[in-house]
Regions:
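Extracellular/periplasm-exposed beta-strand and loop segments of Gram-negative cell-envelope proteins
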Residues: 91-96, 102-109, 137-141, 170-208, ...
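Residue-level signature of outer-membrane beta-barrel architecture
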Residues: 120-122, 152-154, 170, 216-220, ...
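Repeated loop/turn-to-beta-strand initiation elements of outer-membrane beta-barrel proteins
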Residues: 125-130, 157-162, 223-226, 273-281, ...
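Cleavable N-terminal export/targeting peptides
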Residues: 1-53
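Transmembrane beta-barrel strands of outer-membrane/channel proteins
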Residues: 82-86, 128-134, 164-172, 230-236, ...
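Hydrophobic, lipid-facing positions within transmembrane beta-strands of outer-membrane proteins
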Residues: 76-78, 112-116, 144-150, 208-214, ...
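Outer-membrane beta-barrel "beta-signal"
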Residues: 301-315
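Transmembrane beta-barrel domains of Gram-negative outer membranes and organellar outer membranes
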Residues: 36-157, 171
Length: 315
C-alpha cells in the first residue's frame, strides 16, 4: 500500500534518508516550521502485483455468489436469509504486500464475514437478491457494502436444474491496514516499525465487482431433498485502496488501483430443514495470481473458504 511513495519519490528508497528529510521538514534553524508534507498520487497496478493481489483477495471474500441453483419463484414472494462465511487468516509472507511485496501490512482483520440477504420473486421466473452491510465497526474494520443479484432458472425438469445469475457489489471497507495498532506502539524507525508509522491509519478499500455465474444441481429425493450443486463464474474486480497514514511526519494519501478478471467455482448442497427453512453450505474457490519478490513469475495464491446460508421463505 505504500509502494507508490517509493515509486513516485526515488529519494525515499532508503528509509534513513526519509528520517533525515522528515527532521529537516519539521524543524528549521531559528525555530521556523514548515507545513506538513502530503504525498498524494495515484498508481494503476498490474493484476499480479502483491498489492493488487491483496485487494483481489479481500474483494473475493465478499462476492455475492450463489448458494444452489436459481429456482422458479412466485412473483412477489419474499425470502430472507443470513449468510456467514469463514475468512482464512493469512501468513506473514502473504501479508507482505506493500512496497511491491517488501513490507508487511495487517490483512488479518475479521475471521468471519456475515450479511443479510433478501430475495424477491419477479415475473418471468426472475428473482432479485439484495444485501447490505452497514458501516458498523467490528473486528477493527468498518464495512459499507451493497450487493445485488438477478437470477433465473434456465432448465428445471424432474430432479435436474440449471440456472444463471448476474451479481455485483459497490462499497468500501475501512481499517488500519498500512499502520496497524500493533506497529504504531513502537518508535518510528525501530526494527518493529521500520517505515515510521506514527499512528493508526484509516485506509479505505473500495470494492466494486460484477460477475456472471452458471450453476447446476440434482435433487436427491431419497435423502429428503438434499440437493448438491456446482457453479462456475467469471468476475470483474475494480478495486482501489486510499492510503491514509502518517509516517515520519509525512501524510501518505496515495491511491492504488487495479482492475482484474477472475474465475471462481463453488460446490455445495442445499437441504430443506422445513417447508420454509432452507440450509445451504458450500465451498468457494478463486485462483488469484501474484508475483512475490524475489520471484519474477506469477504463482497461484487462491482464495478458498466455506460459506453458509440459512433462508426462510416468508410467503
Amino acid at each position: 500500500m505504500k509502494s507508490l511513495l517509493i515509486n513516485s519519490c526515488p529519494w525515499l528508497r532508503d528509509y534513513r534518508r526519509l528520517i533525515y528529510l522528515a527532521c529537516l521538514l519539521i524543524t528549521l534553524p531559528g525555530g521556523q516550521t514548515l507545513a506538513q508534507v502530503v504525498i498524494q498520487e495515484t498508481e494503476s497496478l498490474h493484476s499480479d502485483r502483491p498489492e493488487a493481489w491483496a485487494m483481489n483477495y479481500v474483494t473475493s471474500a465478499t462476492l455475492l455468489s450463489g448458494f444452489g441453483v436459481p429456482r422458479s419463484r412466485a412473483p412477489g414472494s419474499i425470502a430472507v436469509g443470513a449468510e456467514l462465511d469463514w475468512v482464512p487468516q493469512l501468513s506473514s509472507t502473504q501479508q507482505r504486500v506493500a512496497f511491491s511485496g517488501t513490507d508487511q501490512v495487517d490483512l488479518n482483520k475479521a475471521p468471519i464475514f456475515g450479511r443479510p440477504r433478501v430475495t424477491i420473486g419477479l415475473p418471468w421466473r426472475f428473482a432479485l437478491t439484495l444485501s447490505y452491510v452497514p458501516p458498523i465497526r467490528i473486528f477493527g474494520v468498518k464495512p459499507n457494502l451493497f450487493a445485488f443479484a438477478l437470477e433465473r432458472p434456465l432448465y428445471e425438469r424432474n430432479a435436474w436444474a440449471i440456472g444463471m445469475r448476474m451479481y455485483g457489489q459497490i462499497g468500501n471497507v475501512e481499517g488500519a491496514i498500512t499502520c496497524p495498532g500493533d506497529v504504531v506502539q513502537f518508535s518510528p524507525g525501530s526494527p518493529e516499525n521500520l517505515y515510521g508509522c506514527e499512528k493508526k491509519s484509516a485506509d479505505k478499500l473500495s470494492q466494486h465487482s460484477a460477475g456472471l455465474e452458471l450453476s447446476g444441481a440434482y435433487r436427491i429425493e431419497r435423502l429428503r431433498g438434499l440437493t448438491p450443486y456446482i457453479a462456475v463464474a467469471g468476475n470483474f474486480l475494480d478495486t482501489q485502496v486510499g492510503v491514509n497514514a502518517q509516517t515520519f511526519g509525512i501524510l501518505d494519501r496515495n491511491r492504488l488501483e487495479a482492475e482484474t478478471w477472475t474465475f471462481s467455482a463453488s460446490v455445495g448442497a442445499t437441504y430443506p430443514l422445513t417447508n420454509k427453512l432452507m440450509l445451504s453450505v458450500g465451498m468457494f474457490y478463486s485462483p488469484l495470481w501474484v508475483t512475490r519478490p524475489p520471484a519474477t513469475s506469477s504463482q497461484n495464491d487462491a482464495f478458498i473458504n466455506v460459506r453458509a446460508l440459512l433462508t426462510y421463505q416468508l410467503n
